[in-house]
Amino acid sequence: FLGTINLSLCEQERDADEEERRDEPNESNVEVEKRFLSGIVGMLGKLFGK
């Protein structure tokens, strides 16, 4: 009985870890997009600000 509970908890942890791994690339892509877009906005601001 305890072995079944332990196995179930391990499976839940593994599923949570897999979900985290799937989320990480998306988060890094969003941060890259934010930096890229802020750079473009900054360049346009300098270009049109002159």
From Swiss-Prot:
Effect of mutating S38K: Increase in antimicrobial specificity
Modified residues (Phenylalanine amide): F48
Compartments, as annotated in UniProt: Secreted; Target cell membrane
Record GO cellular component, one term: membrane
Native organism: Pelophylax saharicus (Sahara frog)
Signal sequence, start to end: 1-10
Similarity field: Belongs to the frog skin active peptide (FSAP) family. Temporin subfamily.
Biotechnology: Attractive candidate as antimicrobial coating agent. When this peptide is covalently grafted to a surface, the adhering bacteria are most probably permeabilized (killed or at least damaged), thus unable to grow.
Protein's UniProt name: Temporin-SHa
